[in-house]
């Protein structure tokens, strides 16, 4: 069954349905314009539900569900499904916050269900090739990683307009809100722009981090970071009046994560993430005319070693190996890209058929035992961003004479945050720990 039948849910259902039977569809907006109607027409024999809980109660023959809903509802839906013994495929990021990722990882292991996160790049031949280069130590010890994206491609960094809007007649807005606080309907959230608001989305980092950071995280065997810090871009809609929108994600950000050495790389690593159109400069060994990462340098990764650089685009595609005094090695993933989604979905389906812990299960590239800690690491960046933007109840008022006064220093979370990953705790700034999890409406616990 597909929970979330529009948008990405519509796309992936078409893919895995070529191998399996779709017996149910679920979406809070039955006649939504972003693919829900298409899904219902394509699978006319599938029972349709608005409430996922009703679907899980009624459909006794279900084996597995895909979850393609806004980030803030991933955990509550997935936990309900797994606790019923259902296998689950969840879009990236796995969850809305760090605590939820830890909980889902434990539930999956307890119930021995087959899981996969929808970061399809993990199944690319590009990641396999990068792993080969890392294992052979072709650029020596890797000490720095740059990763970046052109996201957001939705409005972000501004206040939400307070216009009164009429809710679409068939949209169940209360179900769409899920664990988030009750609020009036706005088209500024549904069906797409929810990504830029912390109650529902995870910003540019949450949207693309699991796609872009998968290659270095996996190939270098990274785990929890030791610390994190960030800076964010400023937006001024009026002179000397900086936007302060703590409920919304910033227009751009830079996040720095540090990791200890691993069994795959005998060096500490500094990982620098950039979004909002920011990207690194050309490092040594990469010719000035070469794109960084993918074409036009819009998204990418640079892994900086002692004697060279590994570059790739989103999903680990198109990796290149640059070494001093040697010809650049390029590995083409053009053909594989055409089947990337299908390969990722079929890993999950084959794992279900073979069973939890089977050889086929071990071929799954993003089961929750991997995707959970990985998502925690990605969302550490968002914890730092939210801490950076946190300053208490007072909204700052800037003027030419007060821009650098003590009022500006109220942003008390602008520091390096030290992280105890095993215990999910910031050890040097307790206020930031409120962003490890979230508050939930009654009836929406996981």
Predicted regions and their residues:
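Glycine-rich, aromatic-lined ligand/substrate-binding cores of catalytic
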Residues: 164-165, 169-367, 372-396, 403-446
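Short, solvent-exposed turn/loop segments enriched in Gly/Ser/Thr/Pro and often Arg
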Residues: 29, 49, 68-73, 94-96, ...
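Short aromatic-enriched loop/helix-cap "lid" or pocket-rim segments at secondary-structure transitions
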Residues: 37, 129, 155-161, 241-242, ...
